Amino acid sequence: FTVVKDEFIHNKVIAHRGAWKHYGNHQNSRHALRKAIELGCEGSEFDVWLTKDKYIAINHDYEYDGMIVELSKLSDMRRVVLEKGEVMATLDEYLNIIREQNRTRLVLELKSMPHNKIGLELTDAVVAMVHEMGAQAWVDYISFDYEVLKRVRALDPTAHIAYLGAVVPMDQQKIEGISGIDYHFSQFDKMPRLYDRARMLGLTINVWTVDDPKIMERMLDMGVDFITTDEPAMLLEMIEKRNKQ
């Protein structure tokens, strides 16, 4: 564990797959991460998969240029050249970038194909790498797979962990060590008591993916802890204006 001077930003803004929109950056790329850091986002969200040859690769979908990530070698996928000459990024590269500073953090989504055991294997590998690189202070974990989150908690008692799904009751989440909920913003319209219930249980609240300024305003008025967005600069400007009022 690396001792870090706590200068981390607390402005609620989580750049969804990094800051890519409007900047010519590929989603989940090194440039997108660096831009999120440059903008001053509280966090930069990204997605990880385990490749056939056991690398921890960064990509949103289960496919990458027609190749299924879990069934493909990293070297084959890296033959695909992305915007600005980049190739598929890996977790160690992201951790090296994020550890260059102590203002922006990572929000790491653990991904796997449904109904397989690779999710737990990925989880073990990810947490091990984060610990080996002393990057615990920079990394939060999220997933739709509840068993994956329980494994993270078993491996790291101090990590911040948020559940993306709505299957497991919040009471159970709290008992089993989940730190927060991470729901689509529409869930709070469907279930008006959701916010108050989460607050009563002491769970943090993240909402995704909020790109409409009117919904941004509504989520800020509600008082959520984090807002995941493809428009981080817009949200940052909105928050700055509100803070001056």
Report the location of each language-model feature.
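Phosphate-group recognition and catalysis centered on beta-loop-alpha active-site segments
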Residues: 1-245
